[in-house]
From Swiss-Prot:
<dbReference type="InterPro" id="IPR023214">
    <property type="entry name" value="HAD_sf"/>
</dbReference>
<comment type="similarity">
    <text>Belongs to the class B bacterial acid phosphatase family.</text>
</comment>
<dbReference type="Pfam" id="PF03767">
    <property type="entry name" value="Acid_phosphat_B"/>
</dbReference>
<feature type="binding site">
    <location>
        <position position="69"/>
    </location>
    <ligand>
        <name>Mg(2+)</name>
    </ligand>
</feature>
<keyword id="KW-0378">Hydrolase</keyword>
<feature type="binding site">
    <location>
        <begin position="136"/>
        <end position="137"/>
    </location>
    <ligand>
        <name>substrate</name>
    </ligand>
</feature>
<dbReference type="GO" id="GO:0046872">
    <property type="term" value="F:metal ion binding"/>
</dbReference>
<feature type="active site" description="Nucleophile">
    <location>
        <position position="67"/>
    </location>
</feature>
<dbReference type="InterPro" id="IPR010025">
    <property type="entry name" value="HAD-SF_ppase_IIIB_AphA"/>
</dbReference>
<keyword id="KW-0574">Periplasm</keyword>
<protein>
    <recommendedName>
        <fullName>Class B acid phosphatase</fullName>
        <ecNumber>3.1.3.2</ecNumber>
    </recommendedName>
</protein>
<dbReference type="GO" id="GO:0003993">
    <property type="term" value="F:acid phosphatase activity"/>
</dbReference>
<feature type="binding site">
    <location>
        <position position="191"/>
    </location>
    <ligand>
        <name>Mg(2+)</name>
    </ligand>
</feature>
<dbReference type="InterPro" id="IPR036412">
    <property type="entry name" value="HAD-like_sf"/>
</dbReference>
<comment type="function">
    <text>Dephosphorylates several organic phosphate monoesters. Also has a phosphotransferase activity catalyzing the transfer of low-energy phosphate groups from organic phosphate monoesters to free hydroxyl groups of various organic compounds.</text>
</comment>
<keyword id="KW-0460">Magnesium</keyword>
<feature type="signal peptide">
    <location>
        <begin position="1"/>
        <end position="22"/>
    </location>
</feature>
Amino acid sequence: MKNVMKLSVIALLTAAAVPAMAGKTEPYTQSGTNAREMLQEQAIHWISVDQIKQSLEGKAPINVSFDIDDTVMLFSSPCFYHGQQKFSPGKHDYLKNQDFWNEVNAGCDKYSIPKQIAIDLINMHQARGDQVYFFTGRTAGKVDGVTPILEKTFNIKNMHPVEFMGSRERTTKYNKTPAIISHKVSIHYGDSDDDVLAAKEAGVRGIRLMRAANSTYQPMPTLGGYGEEVLINSSY
């Protein structure tokens, strides 16, 4: 009798534990994915802010540079969308229109949203004593309203003027390479292929940030396409 009772208790306990370890109740109809597979699906060198910090431990302060649009600013897209609608609806000719650059660089970025990952990165670098620079592929406007906005937004301790590389003459293949070299940058952060390739051309460490899926800057680049490090959770 005692043995029967013991078996009954064990059976009840086992049944109670089943829901906690239960599998899917219905077979999936689509391939789908999960959080781990999303990170493991492709051979990408993912890296975190903490890992970057660890890689710099014991090293003297360095110079680091950031692209602006889609890298430190989550949503500068409205400025470009407005510019396209105003100066060349349905076309990209507005990017060659100096009136557009005068307008967007004069202060449109005050409507942009900073990326949290950029705030975390910049805070980490400034805590180390690193110097922060901003390089952009934009063409310079008559007034630089970008520098003071970035200085305030990211609480930059020793702000350097933004380098507008879009219209500068160069002997390099990529437009940010001269700035990376002249400012002795050790790490360059950016979302575009040109950012990654400019870092490679300059011979420095390039780390890619993810571009937000709803950015107007299309097509989307391939993360890890050049074997570069990619900052995890960096689309926002």
